[in-house]
């Protein structure tokens, strides 16, 4: 396939007008045209890399934690229709027994239709009961390396991220023991600055949904956010225009740099569906517009109802983030953070030919997966 007349998002994080060649499912810049080759005229549209979501829980009425293959496939199909072509869905805080079932379904899943399942984000149970958010406090426990390794084996090596509250007893030891096996993210935490610094020194390198479920910044208690800034951690942002004020989103890009910001959806099963009553991790959730909250605790946000592509679009169109920065934060950075950037997150030669064509307002015109048009809205 040749995509002609596109404004291509280059590996240098700029746009360049030209043609994009895909051969055998992968980007092949400079390859000579073939007789009878399919040509897709972009007519000047943006050509963006397929997005990579490393933290979301579900969509279209299905939750990853349902441990249901049909549900997982429905999620993958929906995400692909929204330009998200690689997914690393998140578990919730559950017992090992419940997590086993989730890992079994993920390990058995076969890519080939919809977004590729490239990992699992283990959000809990190694978190703080004092910053529980929408997680279930019943299953919170100390970090357990043996348990993690059993789950990792069960998943077939799919676990790419493990969330940890470093201030909880024994959790720093877990970080030291396991950081060479999986990306460790500080999350759902009451940690102070010094303990966060110790966690990064021990091998943590990531922050889950920055600003949410963690101490904020003050001039006398800088907390984990300043520790993350000083140690060059990757930081997740939910840019649904509910979780974080636009000024704070811009502040984060300006301080951490667009090479360390990762946009996530943190979406739950209501994503792609109307307002109503849903669930997340076994807890009742009410969705009105873009806002999802625990039904019994309406001041507690329970994930988002917005897909990653729309979060990226809002970051640009509603929050003032430069397009080049937002695209990087939704493609290359998440792929790199979980170690799948040799295949996903970029339009560099050799990567999968995953392309989203979008107009000037970032409306999706077409989605190309490995050189095949899978959605065409032109």
Model-identified regions with their sequence ranges:
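Alpha-helical scaffold segments that flank or form the walls of functional sites
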Residues: 46, 54, 64-116, 138-154, ...
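Active-site core of metal-dependent hydrolases
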Residues: 153-273
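His/Asp/Glu-enriched, well-ordered alpha-helical/loop segment
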Residues: 224-235, 253-265, 271-351, 355-357
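Conserved, mostly hydrophobic/aromatic
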Residues: 44, 122, 178, 207, ...
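Divalent metal-dependent hydrolysis catalytic cores, especially in the metallo-beta-lactamase
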Residues: 57, 73-102, 115-128, 155-167, ...
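Histidine-rich, glycine-flanked metal-binding segment
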Residues: 1-48
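Active-site gating loops and adjacent loop-to-helix segments of metal-dependent hydrolytic enzymes
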Residues: 77-88, 128-156, 200-210, 221-234, ...
